[in-house]
Amino acid sequence: MVILIAGSSHTGKTHLAQRLLETLKWPYLSLDHLKMGLIRSGHTQLTPESPDEALTALLWPIAREMAKTAIENGQNLVIEGCYIPYRFREEFPPEYRAQITYVCLVFSQAYLDRHFDQVVAHENCVEQRRNAGVDQTELKLENARHLQACQVLGERFFLIDGPYDAAIQRLCQDLAQETTERGKFSP
């Protein structure tokens, strides 16, 4: 079983993956870690500032095949990052798709208006990262794009509009329940 967690920067993808690790005892792969490993090892000329499209083209094929391998091996894995393409399902056969749960974390525009300072203040709740200089307008645009893409494609999104910790706890519980109710993959 594989859980894919997508969303724009600062929505708490790594935080949710860490909560799922603690709750389900499932390992997770941060696509940011994969990105930095490939960059620092010299396996790509891309940089952390490269366009998301270029980074997705590099990272997603690797993550996709890791997801397939986990499913084939009957293993559980959470993959989180902003480099999961919206049309990821097209790259998996139906029997694999049945073993994938996807959720895109999205802040509502009103939430960002009310809590932008808190969002930035909590950017290091799981990992210590350098201040990214987050722009509120750009973050609102990113979240609106994610919401629209999920709605158009019929993909699951989780709209964060109220107390953050309670929302993430509820989503974590929902995902835990869903994954326990599903069966194992039989190739």
Which functions belong to the PLM regions below?
Residues 14:
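Walker A/P-loop
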Residues 18-64:
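Conserved substrate/cofactor phosphate-moiety recognition/catalytic segment
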Residues 5:
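Hydrophobic anchor at the beta1->P-loop junction of P-loop NTPases
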